[in-house]
């Protein structure tokens, strides 16, 4: 019924699909026990498996689960699926095996890599269904991703369809007056203006007396402790310009720029945020940027058993704007990077054909008779992402970060043009995809 409502609710410019989310199913079956992350009983597992199989039979592409501390409830608690047992996940996977369709997807923290990967192997071996998971470079164990890639190679050699989803650039945070986070968000003096419109905040910040009060409060122990985490990592924080540089040099960090001017980094960033009516954005790459570069991303992108993924364009809308990952993939890796450039045909194949096949869509991603006429016509020399901007067009005037790109001249979906030079044409041929899709003509 939910899929039917999604498909009928509105028309779409592109196709969309659904997964069966583990968290919702676990709460439905186990109630408060599920929310408290209690172990599932055999009966609980059987009920969850039945629901997941029914969802996939109705048209969901597969089953997804989260095992990361980065995902939290609205109360800040870990999600119900964080510690779900191997028996629970294997039991659900077996149900898809009996059904003979559906993919398995996992997000996890890589803290218990050996046990987790052994569980992934069992999920695939006992179900026969393909599994993919997110893989990033951890700054605290910057070489650990290599051992994960090696495990994938061994699994593939054993006939297990396990794939890593990797990103085209660092995964990080955007900070600024219009965003959820900014370096002064915990400052009691800044709090006096925090509820004002952004332009009004910026004007208030130009008052020298107010600035002195903010910086004086920032020197206090309590504020320094509150801000001592990510929001004050000025050695790893950069101004995000237009067009944005997603592989910035350390010499362009906020700390380095302030140092060259003989200024305190906090005062320097204060003046940046107060400029341009408060529209300045700061970029804090957190994952995939150990060593201050994207060399690890290059290794992951080139690996034979990875696909591009993780382009988060619809969640954390005041902090992250990663829907432009495909643009970065082509422009940065296929054209702009000074070393480690990757062949453009390889990147296009990965982004189009390989990502589609990973989720069971064998009817698209290839320009050939019998396949979906979904394509972009790109002026490759002009292709680039623009700096994100903030819009207030969510319900109740809610805020979201959006990002445009130059260079995409035409976008066709099912043979109909839906975008022309970055603007919608009004055509809405998109549809809800139900289950795996196959071309009328098979090619290798």
Kindly give the residue locations of the regions a language model identified.
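Active-site neighborhoods of metal-dependent hydrolases
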Residues: 19, 23-29, 36-44, 48-74, ...
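Short, solvent-exposed cationic patches
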Residues: 432-444
């Amino acid at each position: 019924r939910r899929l039917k409502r999604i498909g009928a609710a509105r028309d779409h410019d592109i196709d969309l699909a659904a997964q069966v989310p583990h968290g919702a199913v676990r709460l439905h079956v186990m109630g408060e026990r599920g929310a408290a992350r209690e172990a599932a009983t055999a009966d609980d597992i059987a009920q969850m498996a039945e629901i997941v199989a029914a969802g996939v039979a109705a048209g969901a592409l597969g089953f997804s689960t989260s095992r990361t501390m980065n995902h939290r409830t609205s109360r800040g608690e870990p999600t119900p699926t964080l510690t779900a047992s191997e028996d629970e996940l294997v039991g659900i996977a077996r149900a898809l095996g009996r059904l003979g369709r559906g993919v398995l997807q996992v997000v996890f923290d890589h803290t218990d890599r050996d046990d987790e990967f052994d569980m992934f192997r069992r999920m695939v071996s006992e179900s026969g269904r393909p599994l993919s998971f997110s893989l990033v470079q951890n700054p605290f164990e910057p070489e650990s991703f290599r051992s994960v890639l090696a495990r994938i190679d061994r699994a593939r050699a054993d006939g297990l369809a396990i794939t890593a989803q990797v990103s085209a650039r660092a995964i990080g945070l955007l900070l600024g007056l219009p965003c959820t986070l900014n370096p002064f968000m915990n400052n009691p003096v800044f709090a006096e203006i925090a509820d004002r419109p952004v332009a009004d905040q910026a004007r208030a910040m130009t008052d020298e007396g107010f600035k002195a009060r903010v910086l004086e409060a920032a020197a206090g122990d309590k504020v320094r402790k509150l801000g001592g985490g990510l929001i004050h990592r000025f050695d790893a924080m950069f101004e995000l310009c237009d067009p944005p540089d997603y592989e910035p040099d350390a010499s362009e960090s906020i700390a380095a720029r302030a140092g060259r001017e003989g200024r305190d980094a906090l005062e320097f960033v204060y003046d940046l945020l107060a400029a341009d009516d408060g529209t300045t954005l700061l970029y804090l790459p957190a994952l995939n940027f150990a060593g201050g570069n994207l060399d690890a991303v290059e290794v992951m992108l080139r690996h034979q058993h990875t696909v591009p993924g993780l382009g988060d364009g619809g969640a954390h809308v005041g902090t992250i704007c990663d829907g432009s990952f495909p643009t970065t993939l082509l422009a940065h890796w296929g054209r702009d990077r000074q070393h480690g450039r990757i062949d453009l045909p390889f990147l296009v194949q990965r982004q189009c054909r390989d990502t589609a096949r990973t989720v069971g869509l064998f009817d698209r991603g290839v320009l050939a008779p019998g396949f979906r006429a979904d394509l972009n016509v790109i002026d490759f020399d002009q292709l680039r992402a623009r700096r994100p901007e903030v819009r207030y067009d969510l319900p109740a005037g809610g805020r979201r970060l959006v990002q445009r790109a130059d260079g995409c001249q035409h976008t066709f979906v099912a043979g109909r043009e839906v975008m022309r030079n970055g603007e919608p044409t009004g055509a809405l041929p998109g549809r809800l995809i139900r289950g795996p899709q196959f071309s009328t003509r098979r090619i290798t």
